[in-house]
């Protein structure tokens, strides 16, 4: 499963000329703390709710408070594990996705990524997890297979 498969279609990107009030309204509506800022299909920034709330003027432009340095993003072909790592390391609620040409194609919410990860791991399927603890020196795939098949 790749980043392109995880995109949440209902999260619109902000434009640099949007005001802070619109950004905060969208963050509240979509229950996210970050939103990408896109200009002519190019990712130009990322805004955080905390930065927006610190701004005294609700009619100020998003471009005045957006992060423009080291904007985190995922490539369309990146694996879901790489996307989850980005969420974890950067503390993001939304990850922008770019294609191979650097064109913005959408965003992934943390919630959507977690749902897809659970789907990938078959969390909803009935079954059980067996944990076998062995010394490293005693590790043998044949022994593990025999233990698993020998117990009903």
Where are these regions (language model features)?
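Alpha-helical/coil-rich non-catalytic "connector" segments in signaling and regulatory proteins
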Residues: 3-4, 15-22, 31-34
């Amino acid at each position: 499963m790749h980043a392109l498969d995880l995109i949440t279609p209902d999260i619109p990107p902000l434009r640099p000329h949007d005001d802070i009030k619109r950004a905060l309204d969208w963050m509240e509506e979509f229950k996210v703390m970050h939103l990408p800022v896109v200009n002519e299909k190019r990712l130009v920034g990322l805004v955080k709710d905390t930065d927006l709330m610190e701004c005294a003027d609700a009619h100020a432009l998003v471009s005045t408070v957006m992060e423009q340095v080291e904007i985190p993003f995922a490539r369309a072909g990146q694996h879901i594990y790489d996307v989850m790592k980005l969420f974890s390391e950067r503390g993001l609620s939304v990850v922008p996705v770019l294609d191979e040409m650097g064109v913005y194609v959408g965003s992934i919410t943390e919630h959507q990524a977690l749902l897809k990860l659970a789907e990938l791991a078959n969390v909803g399927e009935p079954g059980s997890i067996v944990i076998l603890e062995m010394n490293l020196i005693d590790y043998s795939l044949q022994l593990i297979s025999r233990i698993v098949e020998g117990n009903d």
